[in-house]
């Protein structure tokens, strides 16, 4: 026998959780695209130096955090859609939600913080060496670093809200 249909507040909460999972994935995908395509060519004294995001360790960490977060978001999106369609939640999903949301949210938050920190430090160092204006390609490189870090921050906010809901669900379950 099928479970009774959920009450309207439970449906709207499930829709909110689904929306937050989708937003998390979207923020992480856009951050990945911006970060992975971030490069600049610096011409100095007749020689050109190609500088990629992967030349900065903190940007690599950001990329790793975004990839791991995206994999988790896709897995959770699958489970959320499955639960939404069937109306039944696997007991294992409570623990996955509880621990996974917390772990991945902190990973994404530290990726964002690393991105903001290294971008500011590198930009300040570069400004001390060379006059930089907003049309300079190097400034665009740093702006993309800030954009990626901002998107990771937005993904963290979504994951933090999801973490609060998963804490309530875990407490309610026990």
Curated annotation (Swiss-Prot):
GO terms for cellular component: plasma membrane. Residues 36-60, 119-150 are extracellular. It comes from the Eukaryota. It is found in: Cell membrane. Residues 1-14, 82-97, 172-174 are cytoplasmic. Keywords: Cell membrane, Membrane, Transmembrane, Transmembrane helix. InterPro entries: CASP_dom. The chain crosses the membrane at residues 15-35, 61-81, 98-118, 151-171. Disulfide bonds: none annotated. Its main location: membrane. It is a multi-pass membrane protein. It holds the Pfam family CASP_dom. Homodimer and heterodimers. Belongs to the Casparian strip membrane proteins (CASP) family. This is CASP-like protein 4D2. It comes from Arabidopsis thaliana (Mouse-ear cress).
């Amino acid at each position: 026998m099928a479970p009774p249909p959920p009450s309207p507040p439970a449906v709207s909460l499930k829709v909110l959780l689904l929306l937050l999972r989708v937003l998390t994935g979207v923020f992480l995908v856009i951050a990945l695209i911006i970060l992975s395509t971030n490069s600049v060519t610096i011409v100095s004294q007749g020689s050109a130096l190609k500088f990629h995001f992967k030349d900065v360790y903190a940007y690599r960490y950001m990329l790793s955090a975004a990839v791991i977060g995206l994999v988790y978001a896709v897995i959770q999106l699958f489970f959320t859609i499955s639960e939404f369609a069937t109306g039944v939640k696997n007991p294992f999903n409570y623990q996955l939600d509880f621990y996974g949301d917390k772990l991945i949210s902190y990973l994404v938050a530290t990726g964002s913080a690393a991105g903001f920190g290294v971008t500011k430090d590198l930009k300040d160092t570069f400004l001390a060496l060379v006059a930089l204006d907003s049309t300079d390609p190097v400034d665009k490189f740093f702006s993309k670093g800030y954009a990626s870090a901002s998107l990771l921050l937005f993904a963290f906010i979504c994951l933090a809200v999801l973490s609060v809901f998963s804490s309530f669900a875990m407490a309610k379950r026990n």
